[in-house]
Amino acid sequence: MSNALIRLEQVGVTFAGQNVLENIQLSVEPGQIVTLIGPNGAGKTTLVRAVLGLLKPDTGSVWRKPKLRVGYMPQKLHVDPTLPLSVLRFLRLVPGVDRTRALAALKEVGAEQVIDSPVQSISGGEMQRVLLARALLREPELLVLDEPVQGVDVAGQAELYSLITRLRDRHGCGVLMVSHDLHLVMSTTDQVVCLNRHVCCSGHPEQVSGDPAFVELFGKNAPSLAIYHHHHDHAHDLHGSVVTQPASGHAHVHGENCKHG
C-alpha cells in the first residue's frame, strides 16, 4: 500500500441523514486501472468528489500522495452555443498551455484535426477525446475518468478503452474510471469495484475476449472489452440499503469477495 497514489480508508458520507457512502476502502497505484461501476444513485459521483478533494468525508480518511498531480475528465461538458470557443482556446484555459502543447495532447488522443473547430461543432466521440487531452495536459500521475465512453457506440468505446490503456502504459499513471455499465468493462482493468453506497464486490474482470461468441459480437474490438460477472450474496431495496432478510429467509452474509461488513 506504500506505493499508492491515493487511498480511502473506511470513508463514509452522509447527506440529510442518509448514508451515501459507507465504509469505503479503495486505493489506486501507479500503472493500475481501477474501474468503479454501479447503478444510478450508488454514490459513484460522491466518491469521485472525495477522491478529487472536493468533498470531505464525514467518517474515514482520504490519503493522497504529496503533491499528487491529478488529471480529471468530467462526464460531460455543456458549452453555451453562443460562446465563441474553439478547442484550442478551451485547452488553453489550462495554465501554461500554448498551441504546440495543445496540438501534442490532441495528437496523443487522435483528435488533432479539431484543434481550430468550435467545441459546439465536434462529435460526442471527439469531445471525449478533447476532454481526455485536457486531462493529459496536467501531466497527471492519476487520471480520474468519469464515464469516458458515455454516448459513444460499442466500436467507439473499444477504441477509447484501447487509447486509455496506451496512455496508462506510456505515462505510467494510475487510472480511476467510473462507469454505469454493470457488465461491460475494460479487459485491461486490474480491479473492478462494484459500488452501491458500499463496496458490494470487487475483482478482476473475466477474460472473455477469446470466446467465439464474444468475438463475433464485438469483432476486432473484442480484445479491448471484457465481461465482469458479479458475485453478490445480498440484495438492496429501492433506497439502496442492504436487505438483511431476503424472501428466502437467509440472513445477509458477505462472501470472500465482499469488502465490507
UniProtKB/Swiss-Prot annotation:
Gene Ontology cellular component terms for the protein in this record: plasma membrane
Catalytic activity, EC: 7.2.2.20
Reactions catalysed according to its record: Zn(2+)(out) + ATP(in) + H2O(in) = Zn(2+)(in) + ADP(in) + phosphate(in) + H(+)(in)
Signal sequence interval, chain numbering: none
Presence of keyword Cell inner membrane: yes
Primary localization: membrane
Membrane topology: Peripheral membrane protein
CDD domains in the cross-refs: ABC_Metallic_Cations (cd03235)
Alphabetized UniProt keyword annotations: ATP-binding, Cell inner membrane, Cell membrane, Ion transport, Membrane, Nucleotide-binding, Translocase, Transport, Zinc, Zinc transport
One Pfam assignment: ABC_tran
Family per similarity comment: Belongs to the ABC transporter superfamily. Zinc importer (TC 3.A.1.15.5) family.
The protein's assembly and partners: The complex is composed of two ATP-binding proteins (ZnuC), two transmembrane proteins (ZnuB) and a solute-binding protein (ZnuA).
Record's protein name: Zinc import ATP-binding protein ZnuC
Source organism of the structure: Pseudomonas fluorescens (strain ATCC BAA-477 / NRRL B-23932 / Pf-5)
